[in-house]
Amino acid sequence: PSLSYNSEKISVSFEKGLAYKFFDDGKVSIAASIKPNLRPYKSSYSTDLAGMKRSTFYDGVLNVSYQMSRGLKAKLAIGNELTTEHNGNGADLSLNQFIPIFGQPIIFTAGARWYDSNRANYFYGVNSSEVSGQRTEYAPGSTTLPYLSINTFHPINTHTNLFAGVNFNFFPSNVVNSPIVKRKSSASVVIGLNYNF
């Protein structure tokens, strides 16, 4: 379950944190937020991760969006980690295209996330203190991770929507070469109900 609150300038949600929109002229919008990031993994997920500790952290983020044309929007988010878990920076650049197909709204997104070396190491690296017989020390350096997603929603009544999404993430060679990464890509599916009060 997830709860969110949205007004003209302020939004609060588990996924995006606390955001304040301080500019919006209908074409360009600019907002600042404090965004939570769940721990990338737990050591209990795999024997390959035994002894490796990662925690939830928070970013200060500047979000900019630009409505390029009807249904086409560009988004840029630039973030800096605030909780000193890794002191890393990141950015996310994407294009969103809204297309109605047989009356069903479909949103296609293509983008890329950039992580500086500190952030990439927190997600995919192995520190000297984490070396074991199963893994060697590894620092991926800064990295760029392309992604694609397809999302849709369907109104059930005036308050309730059914939503679904498919997400694909692609890992570059400096991530794939990490001893704790076993795949070149990942995929996820989300299906749920959204209720508006």
What role is predicted for each listed range?
Residues 1-34:
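Glycine/small-residue-rich interface belts in oligomeric ring/scaffold proteins
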Residues 3, 14, 30-32, 64, ...:
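Membrane-embedded beta-strand positions of outer-membrane beta-barrel proteins
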Residues 82-163, 167-175, 180-182, 195-197:
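Outer-membrane beta-barrel transmembrane domain signature
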